[in-house]
């Protein structure tokens, strides 16, 4: 039967998905499902949606403990994180470091790795962080936001200012390194992968801003500040990750 005559398979609504049975979440069966998800072989849209829900909602206490362990290591040994922490401390009038209790791991109900709020600090979403190295990138990203907020008094409700700090955070954190993009998008357009990743992430973040009315408005904000913000590597001398 040709694919054009097969009934379309649709993913279930996220509100209708519940956590799978324990037998599906551990051991060989979880390994099998993970392999199928990574390869895409025989994976239906509903199975994909179920796996993603299960991944982000299973073993939450264990993931939070792992996140805290990774955070301790990154704060102690990551060159980029320690560099950012040092420069943020220099901006602090009291010359005090970022309080450890202002960087927390917790379960999140939004689909991103972390966030920064000037009144509360940095949140690392333990149920969305897959590795120590991903946590390092996410924390470095959020620390760029902290630095920009302290040095430039960034107003996140100004879309151009928001776009600028997002461009800088994705550029300096390492999350857009070419190898990461090659794994996601292949070898095509190799020379532009770094910039395309930064632009894509910045547009998505600005589009999610409550004062942004459309994707087009987000793209315009990013375009307007792109050249100046992409070339601003402070406090680094250059992009090295």
Curated annotation (Swiss-Prot):
The active site is at 142. GO terms for cellular component: mitochondrial inner membrane. Its EC number is 3.4.24.-. It is an enzyme of class 3 (hydrolase). It comes from the Eukaryota. GO terms for molecular function: metal ion binding; metalloendopeptidase activity. It is a peripheral membrane protein. It is found in: Mitochondrion inner membrane. Coiled coil: none annotated. Keywords: Hydrolase, Membrane, Metal-binding, Metalloprotease, Mitochondrion, Mitochondrion inner membrane, Protease. A divalent metal cation binds at residues 141, 145. Belongs to the peptidase M76 family. Has a dual role in the assembly of mitochondrial ATPase. Acts as a protease that removes N-terminal residues of mitochondrial ATPase CF(0) subunit 6 at the intermembrane space side. Also involved in the correct assembly of the membrane-embedded ATPase CF(0) particle, probably mediating association of subunit 6 with the subunit 9 ring. This is Mitochondrial inner membrane protease ATP23. It comes from Lodderomyces elongisporus (strain ATCC 11503 / CBS 2605 / JCM 1781 / NBRC 1676 / NRRL YB-4239). The gene is ATP23.
